[in-house]
A protein has these predicted regions:
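Aromatic-residue hotspot detector
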Residues: 8-9, 27
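Mature extracytoplasmic or organellar-lumen-exposed domains after removal of signal/transit peptides
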Residues: 17, 21-47, 51-170
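C-terminal motif of bacterial Sec signal peptides marking the signal peptidase cleavage site
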Residues: 1-2
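Short, conserved catalytic or interaction motifs in soluble domains
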Residues: 5
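Juxtamembrane and targeting peptides
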Residues: 9-19
Length: 170
């Protein structure tokens, strides 16, 4: 999956489709602690001391592992999509934590964000509005507000506008 691009497709849109029919409010509730860890990881991505990144990343891995071990949805297809998405998120976070190079961690965080967007869209997540951002280098990330800073840069004074809302991906 990539932040988009077939040749004639606008590059300011993602190719992921939101599967609203898959929405399961219980699943939304179950993944909320995991989603909170994603936002914590992204908030600590630029810190020189990686202790917080390690803490939140490890928590994300443990929570994902716990969810993978259970049926997270009564719908078999949604359950399968959720488990696959959780495994992808877990694998991306594991790769980030194994990496000591800050640039490689940033690249891993970009992949983590893409996996999250794909996962949330696939399960029809609706508990909160998820805003999707992209910078001019086509790095994607998510936020809960309609303005946000770029977690991949140290410029915390530069505000970005979302390119899309997860629940409106078509």
């Amino acid at each position: 999956m990539a932040c988009g691009n077939k040749e004639n497709e606008p590059i300011d849109k993602l190719t992921t489709k939101f599967a609203g029919l898959r929405h399961d409010p219980i699943l939304d509730q179950q993944i909320q602690p995991l989603l909170n860890q994603y936002f914590a990881v992204m908030a600590h991505l630029q810190e020189q001391d990686s202790v917080n990144l390690q803490l939140y990343g490890t928590n994300m891995i443990f929570i994902a592992d716990s969810l993978i071990q259970q049926d997270v949805s009564l719908d078999t297809a949604t359950n399968h999509l959720a488990i696959q998405g959780l495994m992808n998120i877990q694998n991306e976070m594991t790769a980030i934590l194994m990496e000591s190079n800050p640039d490689a961690r940033i690249m891993g965080a970009q992949m983590l964000s893409l996996q999250w967007i794909e996962f949330l869209a696939a399960i029809g997540y609706q508990k909160q509005t998820i805003y999707i951002f992209r910078d001019k280098e086509e790095n994607c990330w998510m936020g809960l507000k309609n303005k946000g800073t770029n977690p991949y840069e140290n410029k915390m004074d530069l505000q970005y506008q979302p390119i899309q809302i997860l629940q409106e991906l078509q």
